[in-house]
Swiss-Prot record:
Name of protein: Flap endonuclease 1
Known cofactor(s): Mg(2+)
Organism, scientific name: Thalassiosira pseudonana
The EC number(s) this enzyme carries: 3.1.-.-
Residue positions binding Mg(2+) 1: D34, D93, E165, E167
Compositionally skewed regions (Basic residues) per UniProt: 376-390
Compositional bias (Basic and acidic residues): 349-370
Segments of this protein annotated with the region N-domain: 1-111
Region annotated I-domain, chain positions: 129-260
Length: 390
């Protein structure tokens, strides 16, 4: 889930922290990719139409009926990364923290509701609803993870098994300088203090070539708060470890943090009869600030040439992929790896950018004003001049 509403809040309050760039802009960068998030996205996106086009889209499978959508997605996308000169390292989730059990229970309840809705849609023949509910039932299990670990190892791409949350481990890799950024859709990578976060890296739609970079320092600066206050803000917004306070939205949460500095002081000024405050926010704060990750000295990132024959055997014999297409892709991978192995410098390494805090502040204020103006125009003509509920 990540942090509820944080992306929108940064867009409104700290627009300079967000930057859309083409994938090629990351040439020469090492990126720690949230593997579970990537696998989930490909399980949903890489699908085939039902027989005769009369049934809901289905995930790709091999002759034994085992799902292969995630394998095709990770294989093709990783080749694309390496072709762009990017060095990916995939980080897999370990055991979830105990205080995430509440969130996991909610997810199980949602899955049960989706199963019931899917059954009803199948009985009524509603294809659109079948597709919608089947996507809600998708999850990456142990087998999908192990399949991808085997694939990536044969491709020569490093894999890390995090002791706990993948986003926390990816953020730690970025903080230590072993990689440039944590690549995930979960905004809590910023709460774990990744200097740079990259989103949309594993979108399966090839036409969506742009990725989004989010810069931690500029986010903190734009929000006008400290890191400790940012952690408390994320807890108030709602995270995997702690429910949000119902009735307090992102804007109000930011206002309260700016005014009172921390959750403890906010609680002293909050009407406890009106607002229900989760009692585990202290533990949630501890998890964000002291999450279990592998020590830097235990991590060695090494990219190697792929193992052509074992890789082809895995994809063709086990996954049921087309031999000719697999061979062509392996040759493309080998060519991309050799090209990326040559010493190359990024263009921005030739230039030293002079900091201009005052200029950045003016840009941020201008951007905020533009956003406010555009929202104001959108509200004209609405009945009574009120807000439109979504």
């Amino acid at each position: 889930m990540g942090i509820k509403g944080l992306a929108k809040l940064l867009s409104d309050e700290a627009p300079l922290s967000l930057k859309e760039v083409p994938l090629s802009h990351l040439h020469g960068r090492k990126l720690a990719i949230d593997a579970s998030m990537a696998i989930y996205q490909f399980l949903i996106a890489v699908r085939s139409g039902g027989p005769g086009g009369q049934n809901a889209a289905m995930m790709l499978t091999n002759a034994d009926g085992e799902t292969t959508s995630h394998i095709q997605g990770i294989f093709n996308r990783t080749i694309r990364f390496i072709s762009e000169g990017i060095r990916p390292v995939y980080v897999f989730d370990g055991k979830p923290p105990q205080f995430k059990s509440g969130e996991l229970l909610k997810r199980r309840e949602k899955r049960l509701k989706a199963e019931q809705a899917l059954k009803a849609a199948e009985e009524s023949g509603n294809i659109e609803e079948q597709d919608k509910q089947s996507k809600r039932l998708v999850r990456a299990g142990t087998k999908e993870n192990e399949d991808c670990i085997k694939l990536l190892t044969l491709m020569g791409v490093p894999v890390i098994r995090a002791p706990c949350e993948a986003e926390a481990q990816a953020a730690a890799l970025a903080r230590s300088g072993k990689v440039y950024a944590a690549a995930t859709e979960d905004m809590d990578a910023l709460t774990f203090r990744s200097p740079v976060m990259v989103r949309k890296m594993t979108f399966a739609n090839a036409s969506k070539s742009d990725v989004q970079q989010i810069f931690y320092d500029k986010a903190i600066e734009g929000l006008e708060i400290t890191h400790d206050q940012f952690v408390d803000l994320c807890i108030l917004l709602g995270c995997d470890y702690c429910d949000t306070i119902k009735g307090i939205g992102p804007k109000t949460a930011l206002k309260l943090i700016r005014e009172h500095k921390n959750i403890e002081t906010i609680l002293k000024h909050l009407n406890r009869e009106k607002y229900v405050v989760p009692d585990i926010y202290v533990e949630a704060r501890r998890l964000f600030n002291h999450h279990e990750v592998l020590p830097d000295n235990e991590i060695e990132l090494k990219w190697t040439e792929c193992q052509p024959e074992p890789l082809k055997s895995f994809l063709v014999d086990e996954m049921g992929f087309n031999p000719d297409r697999v061979q062509a892709s392996i040759e493309k991978l080998q060519k991309a790896f050799k090209a990326s192995a040559k010493p190359q410098s990024r263009m921005d390494s030739f230039f030293k950018v002079k900091a201009n805090p005052e200029g950045d502040k003016k840009k941020a204020e201008k951007r905020k004003a533009e956003l406010a103006a555009s929202r104001g125009k959108g509200k004209k003509g609405k009945g009574g001049g009120g807000f439109k509920k979504k």
